[in-house]
């Protein structure tokens, strides 16, 4: 790999390619911005579908980029559509795995024959876009895989093949979910229900089960793997991963680096990749509220629920008599438009704000926010920990179950709500979160993690700062 070392006077050129979902695109954009700030020429690659969605949500010039920060797109292999919804995840995973390598190689060839653009010297791709490894090896450049889940989620994925070997997956029936899992190094007191949800496959042909076995196995070929977490949060789990794949680095929380290193008003700071318009009025509303008084509710970019579950959450929140900011995506209710009961809207009129999307990192670091009702996606969990905000967790799929387990038992910052959603339980847990003794203890614990997250990203000495610099120097620049 020595051949890729960047010659003096030549700008290093990184191609960043996220998996085409909001929760993967956002952290990859942060990595791209940090590399740009360190002198890299950046090409950021979306799928055509998401490229078009971003232009619709952010305006026709939103992906014009900068002279050294360019946007490109490749097809995802699925029929062309112009919708503003998240694509079906299994279909998308299967398609990217089978169809994206050829257009990606063609894009690299085109970039490398473009005048006045430095040749591609390295690739940073999503952990589940491992087809890029074939292109990188052909080109003789390093490929760093960015696995966007928690370290505990990633370690579980690395062991998916063992679940199949042990006959634990595909599962026989729901009762299997209580099976104790005590053989993953450094992961204690787990049940099968706490393992990423794709393990719940009911047949050997299941797309997601096979996809993660395939992607986790290929991870070992990466020049390095980066994780958006920090050592003190997941120390033992990270060491267990490193015993399987030594070249693993924790470089998070990424949003703390970006907030520190990138001026929000600068050209690079202005570049965004949210597929829904962020309603900044949320922050003005929070400014009118007293500290720790508001419940923030957001189930992320993929979670869907039934109309009945939406109504139960609504009346549970109403019964707490707390102020709340609730993000309700247009596609939150499966196959329908989310409809809140008129009585609920009247009753809560003076103590709520509803939005279809919001600037979440700013919300979770706002002093008015005292608790977070979340789906336990990793970006949300990390932003909540970094803001010192405790959580009520309603995990939906993927490694959200694992994150929820760790939030509740290991990090002591969360309480889990039942999957069926009853308004009485919503009320009880949210009241405990905001006013109860357990809620106070969880807030203290969250504030401890906040301090440790800030330490990890400290200039010069922070563990994540040192790791990020090492990945840049040793791997991406090949020094």
Curated annotation (Swiss-Prot):
GO terms for molecular function: glucuronosyltransferase activity; UDP-glucosyltransferase activity. Expressed in roots, shoots and leaves. PROSITE patterns: UDPGT. The keyword Cell cycle does not apply. Keywords: Glycosyltransferase, Transferase. PANTHER family: GLUCOSYL/GLUCURONOSYL TRANSFERASES, UDP-GLYCOSYLTRANSFERASE 85A1-RELATED. This is UDP-glycosyltransferase 85A5. It comes from Arabidopsis thaliana.
């Amino acid at each position: 790999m020595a051949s890729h070392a960047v010659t003096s006077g030549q700008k290093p050129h990184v191609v960043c390619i996220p998996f085409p979902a909001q929760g993967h695109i956002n952290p990859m954009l942060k990595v791209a911005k940090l590399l740009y700030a360190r002198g890299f020429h950046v090409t950021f690659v979306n799928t055509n579908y998401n490229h078009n969605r971003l232009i619709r949500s952010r305006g026709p010039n939103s992906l014009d980029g900068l002279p050294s920060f360019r946007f490109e797109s490749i097809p995802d292999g699925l029929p062309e559509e112009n919708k503003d919804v998240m694509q079906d995840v299994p279909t998308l995973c299967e398609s990217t795995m089978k169809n994206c390598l050829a257009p990606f190689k063609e894009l690299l060839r085109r970039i490398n024959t473009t005048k006045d653009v430095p040749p591609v010297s390295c690739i940073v791709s999503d952990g589940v876009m491992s087809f890029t490894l074939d292109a990188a090896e052909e080109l003789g450049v390093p490929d760093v895989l960015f696995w966007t889940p928690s370290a505990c989620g990633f370690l579980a994925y690395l062991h998916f093949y063992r679940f199949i070997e042990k006959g634990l997956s595909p599962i026989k029936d729901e009762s299997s979910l209580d099976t104790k899992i005590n053989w993953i190094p450094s992961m204690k007191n787990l049940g099968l229900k706490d393992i990423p949800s794709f393990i719940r496959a009911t047949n050997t042909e299941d797309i997601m089960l096979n996809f993660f076995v395939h992607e986790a196995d290929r991870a070992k070929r990466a020049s390095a793997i980066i994780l958006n977490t920090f050592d003190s949060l997941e120390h033992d789990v990270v060491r267990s991963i490193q015993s399987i794949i030594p070249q693993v680095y924790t470089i998070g929380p990424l949003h703390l680096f970006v907030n520190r290193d990138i001026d929000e008003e600068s050209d690079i700071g202005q570049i965004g990749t949210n597929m829904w318009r962020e309603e900044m009025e949320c922050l003005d509303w929070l400014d009118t509220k007293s500290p720790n008084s508001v419940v923030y509710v957001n189930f992320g970019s993929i979670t869907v629920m039934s109309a009945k579950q939406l109504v139960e959450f609504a009346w549970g929140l109403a019964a707490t008599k707390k102020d709340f900011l609730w993000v309700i995506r247009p596609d939150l209710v499966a196959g329908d438009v989310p409809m809140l009961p008129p009585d609920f809207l009247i009753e809560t009129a003076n103590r709520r704000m509803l939005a279809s999307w919001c600037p979440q990192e700013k919300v979770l670091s706002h002093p008015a926010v005292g608790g977070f009702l979340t789906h336990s996606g990793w970006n949300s969990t990390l932003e909540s920990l970094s803001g010192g905000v405790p959580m009520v967790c309603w995990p939906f799929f993927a490694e959200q179950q694992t994150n929820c387990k760790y939030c509740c038992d290991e990090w002591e910052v969360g309480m889990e709500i039942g999957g069926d959603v009853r308004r009485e339980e919503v009320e009880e847990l949210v009241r405990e979160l905001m006013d109860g003794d357990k809620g106070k203890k969880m807030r203290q614990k969250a504030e401890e993690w906040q301090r440790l997250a800030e330490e990890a990203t400290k200039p010069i000495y922070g563990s994540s700062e040192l790791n990020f610099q090492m990945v840049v120097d040793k791997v991406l620049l090949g020094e």
